[in-house]
Amino acid sequence: AKTALAKVGDVDVTEIEELWHGVEPPYDDLFAWLEGCANKPVSAAKAPFRPVMLANPIEDGDLQKLDPADYAAEWKWDGIRIQAVSEAGVRRLYTRTGDDISHTFPDVVAAMEFDGAIDGELLVRDGDGGVAPFSDLQQRLNRKTVSKKQMETYPAFIRAYDLLVDGAEDVRRKPLSERRKRLERFVAEAGERIDISELVAVTDFDQLEALRADPPHAHAEGLMLKRWDSAYTPGRPKGPWFKWKRDPFLVDAVMMYAQRGHGKRSSFYSDYTFGVWREGEAGAELVPVGKAYFGFTDAELKRLDKFVRDHTVDRFGPVRAVKAQRDFGLVLEIAFEGLQRSPRHKSGLAMRFPRVHRIRWDKPAGEADRIEALETLLAERFDARATR
């Protein structure tokens, strides 16, 4: 809706986000402004949402243009980006898109004993006081109500990245160096449900590259680089902030099920459930480990769609089961960002952000990876790192 309104008025979507919680039906002032018939309305919202600043991914050649001394580095945590606002006795917790999720995290809102607005990551603490996997946070998301047991089992907290409003002062135009100093003082008085994202000492980018590739924290996705002199600018300006995520993990899996996609892909079978081999009672069997789609070229999409239709062995409503045996099947190279244990999945494992990286038409299905490979990866790269 916000994007559609921005297109109607030919304005930046961040301007709509600024007003979103401060306008009410029938929205006469808003539409009059978008139609060019009136000035921009003033938001009457208390504890309003401020549009977030986003980072650009590091691309080839970017680092060669940067001076490490100009940038602060911090961990990129695997939670959800939030904005916590407490002003004039009103407290609100927003997602990065401005959705109010205060009702889902009343324990966090109750602990927001401050005046101002902070940008941060919503996470869950594990039993040792560290960061729990994203799957724990998922137990709290998208709920209309949350029980006392859920709050106790999955205690949420905020890891603060930035300070947007200090008391009654909007500090977004001040440089990051000053906002960070204020944030440190701010968080020191904010209570146990809010801590600060630690900075990583920057000597050179080679040192940061090693940390990015193998973060010492189990649930850090990589690094963020932010210019010390950067203002907090809504949107995704090029240059001030970069995200430098670790390289994805890769596994060869076999297509097991297919569904039609959405939008322009709605006529094609482009969403796939894939599995790896494990030893069952009757020998080797496939066990699902994830579901993903890939932005194929038109030629690839047509070829995949034909493969699914030609080798369907069963149907379950909109889902087609595809022939997948050791001597026949389609291997997909899957890229993913993380791995965690999950009792909800038959394999006992769940991937974070899986996507089809490559189609292995050349590889026999029997040579796809086994569940033991993922178990080893989990033990060595995630379980082990969590105990460092």
Question: How would you name each of these model-derived features?
Answer:
Residues 1-163, 167-172, 176-177, 181-201, ...:
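N-terminal nucleic-acid-engaging modules of covalent nucleotidyltransferase systems
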